[in-house]
């Protein structure tokens, strides 16, 4: 589905659709600081079972080197273009959710027109486009604000998911006709109920 050269230059994970299932939709999933971990794998299984292949971007590896929003946006565009799917779901967890708005807002209109949904799982108010080991220990007060970037996405359907015990989540602050906010039981890791997260994303597809 993707040219091998893209795998050579970006830390990508390809999860093919389940045998016998097909869809015209690609899911691009940007992971959190833990890399391609249990939450990303668990949610992706729901997508692939419904015929949607997943291309995962390992945020731990990708943002180990500092990136500009323009850099990240161009790489996202390359991923979407190389897969040749007419419709796309963008999903991100934690840092992946934090960076997606800035990546999307810099994409061409023709690319953005493909998006069925932008699913943000556990986004925080700020993001820095470089990983620091200290980020594993506490939330960062550095970086750029996520909400102003998100407010630029007026034509996208946004789904924001947060755990009710996640005090750092941006979701409760969001308002807008194109934004759905869902607060679930649990913390930033959603109590490990990843299948339910995947099902909720599917329910919000347009």
Locate each region found by the language model:
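The feature captures the conserved acid-bearing segment of alpha/beta-hydrolase catalytic domains
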Residues: 125-178
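Conserved hydrolase catalytic core segment
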Residues: 103-116
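Active-site nucleophile loop of the alpha/beta-hydrolase fold
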Residues: 59, 117-129, 163, 186
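Short, surface-exposed "cap/lid" segments of acyl-processing enzymes
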Residues: 19-52, 56-59
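Hydrolases whose catalytic domains are alpha/beta-hydrolase-1, hotdog thioesterase
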Residues: 99-103, 129
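C-terminal catalytic histidine-bearing segment of alpha/beta-hydrolase fold enzymes
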Residues: 70, 174, 178-206
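Conserved acidic catalytic loop of the alpha/beta-hydrolase fold
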Residues: 74-88
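Gly/Ala-rich beta-loop-alpha elbow adjacent to hydrolase catalytic centers
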Residues: 91-100
């Amino acid at each position: 589905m993707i040219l091998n050269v893209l795998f050579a230059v970006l830390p990508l994970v390809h999860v093919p659709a389940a045998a016998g299932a097909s869809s015209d939709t690609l899911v691009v999933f940007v992971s959190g600081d833990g890399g391609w971990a249990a939450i990303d794998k668990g949610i992706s299984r729901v997508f692939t079972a419904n015929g949607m292949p997943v291309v995962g971007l390992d945020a731990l590896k990708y943002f180990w080197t500092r990136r500009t929003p323009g850099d990240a946006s161009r790489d996202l565009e390359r991923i979407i273009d190389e897969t040749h799917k007419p419709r796309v779901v963008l999903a991100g967890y934690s840092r992946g959710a934090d960076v997606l708005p800035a990546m999307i807002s810099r994409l061409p209109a023709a690319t953005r027109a493909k998006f069925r949904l932008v699913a943000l799982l556990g986004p925080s108010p700020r993001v820095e486009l470089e990983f620091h080991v200290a980020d594993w220990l506490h939330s960062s007060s550095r970086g750029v604000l996520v909400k102003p970037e998100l407010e630029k996405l007026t034509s996208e359907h946004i789904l924001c998911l947060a755990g009710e015990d996640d005090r750092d989540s941006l979701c409760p602050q969001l308002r807008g006709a194109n934004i759905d906010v869902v607060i679930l039981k649990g913390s930033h890791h959603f109590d490990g109920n990843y299948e339910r997260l995947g099902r909720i994303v599917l329910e919000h597809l347009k």
